Amino acid sequence: DRAVTEVLRGCIRGCRFCQAGYIYRPYRERSVDVINRQAYDLCHNCGYDEVSLSSLSTSDHSHLADLMEKMLVWAEPEHVDLSLPSLRIDSMTPHLLELVQRVRKSGLTFAPEAGSQRLRDAINKNITEQEVLDTCRMSFESGYTAVKLYFMMGLPTETLEDIKGIADTAQQVVDLYYSMEHPKGKGVQVTISVACFVPKPDTPFQFCAQDR
């Protein structure tokens, strides 16, 4: 039960399976002042103690760090949590992670979507395996010990090797954690969430067959 305010509409990415990324074009952002005022009013007028910054990809907002710093001025003293449900791997920076950690104490969620670089390129998910690992490294260095990775199965051109790559990617993240220095006895939790591809109208994959 939380307040929700939309920070942007549309998406700059163009993943070929994502209907929302096409039907909500063009991409446009709300200003920092408007978002901050809406969130403040929602919490003060309706009694919420958590506000979600909603969008297809919240970390793509060009002034997200400024927005979070401004919201934390009133949110921290009043114990209001900020939820950022959509974080892009290639948009994360150490400063942004530091701000996220102040408002999100649990784990982080990222979406590589596919288990191989070939398939990520095919679906226009423009992130590399190295970016996945680099972002997880930043997360671990910031003190996080839980990471959730979202993937899809049944994507067009998918092979068994792509499926195996999902487990391989998760294992690389685990190995990365244990290759770093941590307090003794502090383990890592890497959760894999897998959804089945469903072809959607108005996307490049709209006429692709769905696996049975």
Predicted features and spans:
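Ordered, soluble secondary-structure elements with a strong preference for glycine-centered loop motifs
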Residues: E29, L160, A209
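Canonical Radical SAM [4Fe-4S] cluster-binding loop centered on the CxxxCxxC motif
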Residues: R2-D33
